[in-house]
Amino acid sequence: MKTIDQPTLSSFAPTGVLRVGINLGNPVLANEDPISKNLYGVTIDIANEIGKRISLPVQLIPFKSAGATVDAVKTGEIDLVFVAIDPVRGADISYTPAYIQIEGAYMVKVSSPLKTNDEVDAAGNEIVVGKGSAYDLYLTREIKNAALLRAASSQTVIDDFMSGTGNVAAGVKQQLESDAKRYPGLRMLPGRFMVINQAIGIPKARANYESTSAYLSNVIAELKQSGFVADAMKRHNIQGAKVADQ
């Protein structure tokens, strides 16, 4: 097990507490118990393991969307974030290799004439996305003809869609499948339009961010190889995702 030196640790967690941003907008990563408000999920397990390895207390700070967690890590409010790898965010955030891969999918109403993912990017189609999400950033780059309509978060995409916004909903496959149980008359287009690589991100503004990122990359490699990530996914009943390749 690789150890972390004091200058790197001081740069990584300058307050003496590891402040971790938890994205509740993606149920693959984390969830909140509606009664106790306790946070649980794969990212919570990884955060606590990192805290144990560096001998610091962990403060879990929940956010409703990936975009909000990214903003917080860029301003230095938090020390670490679990977020999708994206080149736009990469200007300010240093990533580890991915620990989980998630599929992005499209959902339409059963009456829709759309049958395949390739048909979505056409003039007249309107795709509802979660503002600032990994798939929003991806589709912003890739979609040429359809329009993108941004919901406040990934969790509200289907609510907006069912209230009459757009004719296609985009999101993490598991989130869409969960939402479809709340609303009748929806169907998923087969396959996926992207693979979302989830990683740990830290702010590049910190003095020793490169050595911190190297340390965390080693931790992630160990957690994948040892079965820690796979066990966490099984424990939290995560479907529609897989442990990222080594």
Residue spans for each PLM region:
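Ligand-binding cleft/hinge of the Venus flytrap
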Residues: 30-36, 47-57, 121-123, 132-153, ...
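A ligand-binding cleft/hinge motif common to bilobed small-molecule-binding domains
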Residues: 67, 84-92, 138-141, 162-195
